[in-house]
């Protein structure tokens, strides 16, 4: 369906032959939003502490140091935390966002970002693996353009 490339449908009830970290992670949009709300609140959701605030800070801090970032996966001006790409510089990135913003996405194009400086998060739920490099930056551009 996406450029003529055959798609393999993942059957969530089948036990995989091999575990794959986040590979095959499935969620509803509402549960994903609640997870992002928890991260935005530094580990708290609905008045319940699920992660310590220092844990969230550690997870979303740059752990690459001076390793250069260059590419679609990790563009200039970014580092990498524990499970997230992290914005480290204001002017070096080709996409908008505040220093401290963190994000990640799935193989089929789903993506999210949390911008602590603006106290917000956004997510895009798509299933277009061959077009994710087009839609992800467009999504972030559109979100930040709407804030102006």
What are these regions (language model features)?
Residues 1-148:
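Catalytic loop of the DD-peptidase/beta-lactamase superfamily, centered on the K-T-G motif
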């Amino acid at each position: 369906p996406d450029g003529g490339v055959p798609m393999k449908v993942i059957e969530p009830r089948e036990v995989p032959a091999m575990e794959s970290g986040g590979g095959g992670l499935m969620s509803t949009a509402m549960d994903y939003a609640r997870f992002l709300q928890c991260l935005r609140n530094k580990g708290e959701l609905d008045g319940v502490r699920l992660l310590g605030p220092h844990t969230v800070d550690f997870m979303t801090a740059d752990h690459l140091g001076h390793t250069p970032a260059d590419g679609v996966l990790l563009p200039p001006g970014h580092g990498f935390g524990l499970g997230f790409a992290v914005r480290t510089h204001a002017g070096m990135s080709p996409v908008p966002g505040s220093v401290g913003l963190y994000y990640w996405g799935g193989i089929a194009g789903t993506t999210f970002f949390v911008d602590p400086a603006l106290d917000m998060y956004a997510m895009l739920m798509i299933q277009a693996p061959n077009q994710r490099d087009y839609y992800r930056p467009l999504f972030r551009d559109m979100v930040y353009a709407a804030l102006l």
